[in-house]
Regions:
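Substrate-gating cap/lid alpha-helix
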Residues: 242-275
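Histidine-centered active-site loop/cap adjacent to the catalytic His
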Residues: 289-312
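N-terminal secretory targeting modules
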Residues: 1-43, 102
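Active-site segments of SGNH/GDSL-like serine hydrolases
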Residues: 222-251
Length: 312
């Protein structure tokens, strides 16, 4: 009995220590940045991933899309809430937090088609478990318990393990062609024509299921915003589709049209417009005219800023 109470006291001390320490730990990016932004009362919150701010070495103007939009719409205060690898799963938690705040900024959400691919969707470092926990916690007090809850495995801090990620099926259309482990990151980083071709296939040529978890997040984002009277504008980011078609012919564009149609169908079902920019520009608008990337150069970012400005 004495041993039992000793262990009980020990675990209580550890638990309380973790709580005390957690008060001195800075909130993760999503929760901290969103909280600070809401306090400042911006008119527009611009979500997004690296497609918002990536630039080309040759750009004379390296401003992100958000800054270009500010120049086009000087009457609006626009906050940049973009960060590399952000996605609809995180945006769902962010919109939920905004709805709880009672504030009603306009929100702009870019939809990156590659974020639905097994290659990105299940990548462990893109799950943002800690940020989503902070954003969806019932109260700030509960959020303070993240550290002890994680230590004692009361919450799942590894939504997808690397082992699970490597076993994720990879598809070309509806046909499985392997698993993630069959495609080596380091090898694909070398830009040979064959590796570029493979990267286009991994990033875009899967068949997007309407039941995909990120599309569930899209539906939830719209429902939360509609209930709270928050206006959201969506757009699908430009894709270097001409380069993809060089490798795969009409199969590439047909699959991409099918996938973007799946996204747009959900938006239209929810009475939202779908600004589909996927096929709107040629390779000269991209950071690299040959690589499978949504990263735009100066001309490309200005094009997107102008299209978004028309919605506001």
């Amino acid at each position: 009995m004495k041993i039992f109470w000793s262990w009980t006291v020990f675990f209580i001390i550890i638990f309380l220590s973790q709580i005390a320490i957690s008060h001195f730990i800075t909130e993760p990016w999503g929760a901290r940045t969103l909280s600070e932004t809401l306090d400042k009362g911006y008119d527009v919150l611009y979500f997004g991933d690296s497609t918002v701010d990536a630039s080309a070495d040759t750009d004379t103007d390296k401003a992100p899309i958000t800054e270009m939009l500010r120049r086009l719409k000087p009457e609006l205060s626009i906050a940049d809430l973009s960060r590399s690898s952000n996605h609809l799963g995180l945006y769902e938690a962010m919109v939920g937090q905004i709805a709880k705040s009672g504030k009603k900024p306009v929100i702009i959400i870019p939809i990156n088609m590659r974020s639905f691919s097994p290659w990105y969707d299940k990548r462990p470092e893109f799950q943002f478990e800690k940020e989503i926990f902070y954003l969806t916690a019932p109260s700030p007090l509960i959020a303070c318990f993240y550290k002890p809850l994680a230590v004692f495995r009361a919450i799942n801090v590894n939504a997808v393990t690397f082992s699970e990620f490597y076993q994720t099926p990879v598809y070309r259309g509806k046909k499985q062609i392997g698993i993630v482990a069959d495609f080596n990151d380091t090898v694909l980083a070398t830009t040979t024509p064959e590796n570029i071709k493979t990267s286009f296939m991994l990033g875009y040529m899967f068949d997007l299921d309407a039941k995909h978890r990120k599309l569930d997040s899209l539906r939830n984002i719209i429902d939360q915003a509609d209930r709270s009277g928050i206006k959201i504008y969506f757009y699908i980011t430009p894709i270097n589709h001409e380069q993809g078609e060089k490798f795969y012919g009409k199969e590439f564009k047909e699959q991409m049209e099918k996938n973007t149609d799946t996204v747009c169908a959900i938006l239209k079902e929810k009475k939202h417009s779908c600004l589909n920019l996927a096929f709107s520009v040629d390779p000269s608008y991209f950071q690299s005219p040959v690589l499978p990337s949504e990263h735009l150069n100066e001309k490309g970012r200005m094009f997107v800023a102008e299209e978004v400005a028309k919605m506001l």
